Structures are given as structure tokens and as C-alpha cells.
Amino acid sequence: MSGNEFKAKAYLKEGCPFSFKFLVFMSEAGLLDRIEIVRMKPHDPGFEAEKDKLAKHLGKAVTFPVVEVEPGQYQTDSDRLIERYAAEAGLTPDAQPVLSFYKQTIFPQLIELFQIKHPKTAKST
């Protein structure tokens, strides 16, 4: 990568099943070199300030993961992000066995727990 080439920045919230789903796909697809991972730790002092910055870029409340896909262009929604990177790489998300396993077994259980803990912020993507 040349010095001026843009590298997407992925803001992944620790403990977030949606962030983990995106990370599972990117890892399994061999695409981790396309993103810079920013670990968002809810208990870190700068978490809320960084989240507020992301909200300003998005123009709405933040849901994770958030990826700066192009300079100044931010996208959320794990499924849309997976579809985007899969299409760019000529891959089919459902053909990824680890991602499929996660989505069919572990992910639904995590969503159930997430909805109990965060009833107002839970989503289904």
C-alpha cells in the first residue's frame, strides 16, 4: 500500500456480537489487511467522546460496527458491511463456514442476551 492510499478504519465495540460477526467474516475471508481495527472499549475513559465523534460523522446514533469505508464516508450494519466486502472480494458470505456456524449457533444466543441487557439498543442484523 502506498503512503497515500486510504485504508478503511473499522470501529469494533468489545463484547458486541455484531462487531464480532463482521470480524469473523473479515478474518475468514482473508480481508483483515484491508482494514485498520480500532477496539472500542466501553469502560475506557475516551469511549463516549469517540462514540460522539462517530455519531457526528454518521448523523445518527452509533451502532457497531462502524467502518469508515472511504475518506469521510461511514457505514454501519454488520450485514451490509459483510455484503460490501464480500462483493468487493468476489465472495459469498453464506459460503464462509465459520461465519455460517457463528450466525446459526452462537449469534442468536448472544443476541438474546444482548436484548436482555440492552433492550433499547438491540437490533437484529
Language-model segment annotations:
Residues 42-125:
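Thiol/selenol-based redox catalytic cores and closely related redox-interacting motifs
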